[in-house]
């Protein structure tokens, strides 16, 4: 994934109070879409240190924490071991480079991940292939924000344009809404976050 080198460097100090707070808001939004997932397998895609997925372990039968950064995965493994978690596993893998042959999931969720992926359509297409029939992809990210100028990330996403792209891939029943607005939460700018729920 783009910016992997940056995440490798900051993995050990990633869990700041601000990130923990945003992760809680994100996981609460995701939880509202997975009420019937107790026996299901989920992937926390681009999991970082697992801040979002750790909040959702009780919502699923099992969770695979997946990231391109070995140091981030190391942080997740340490948390799993320390807390004695039994329904979680980890995988270090880059979806931008290749497609996993045997990976399957009922739910995939990704929070503040898409903005770090330069070319999002191929990755969303590969995630579609990973989903079981009827499975859900849940995306939490920032609404498009013209105040954000960066060479490292997208400046958010237009929900309609993202939904159109996903419809072309094959996703259906696509629903999205803005659910949170915060001060200086996106590259130092005031911003809003949306959640998108799409089904295979």
Predicted features by range, described:
Residues 121-133:
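A short glycine-rich, Lys/Arg-flanked "PGG" loop and its adjoining helix->strand segment in the class I
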Residues 171-182:
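Conserved S-adenosyl-L-methionine
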Residues 112-113:
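Short catalytic micro-motifs in class I SAM-dependent methyltransferases
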Residues 43-97:
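Class I SAM-dependent methyltransferase SAM/SAH-binding core
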Residues 182-200:
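Core SAM-dependent methyltransferase catalytic element
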Residues 109:
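A conserved beta-strand element that flanks and buttresses the S-adenosyl-L-methionine
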Residues 1-37, 75, 138-163:
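Conserved class I S-adenosyl-L-methionine
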């Amino acid at each position: 994934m783009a910016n992997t080198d940056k995440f490798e460097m900051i993995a050990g100090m990633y869990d700041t109070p601000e990130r923990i707070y945003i992760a809680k808001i994100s996981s609460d939004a995701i939880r509202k879409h997975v009420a019937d997932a107790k026996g299901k397998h989920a992937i926390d895609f681009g999991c970082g240190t697992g801040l979002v997925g750790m909040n959702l372990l009780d919502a699923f039968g099992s969770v695979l924490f997946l990231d391109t950064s070995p140091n981030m995965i190391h942080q997740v493994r340490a948390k799993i071991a320390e807390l004695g978690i039994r329904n979680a596993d980890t995988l270090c893998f880059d979806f931008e480079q290749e497609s996993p042959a045997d990976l399957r999931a009922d739910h995939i969720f990704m929070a503040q991940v898409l903005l770090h992926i330069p070319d999002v359509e191929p990755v969303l297409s590969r995630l579609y292939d990973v989903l079981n029939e009827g499975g859900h992809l849940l995306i939490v990210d920032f609404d498009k924000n013209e105040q954000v100028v960066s060479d490292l990330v997208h400046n958010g996403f237009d929900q309609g344009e993202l939904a159109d792209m996903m419809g072309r891939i094959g996703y259906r029943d696509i629903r999205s809404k803005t659910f949170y607005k915060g001060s200086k939460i996106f590259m130092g700018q005031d911003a809003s976050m949306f959640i998108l729920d799409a089904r295979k």
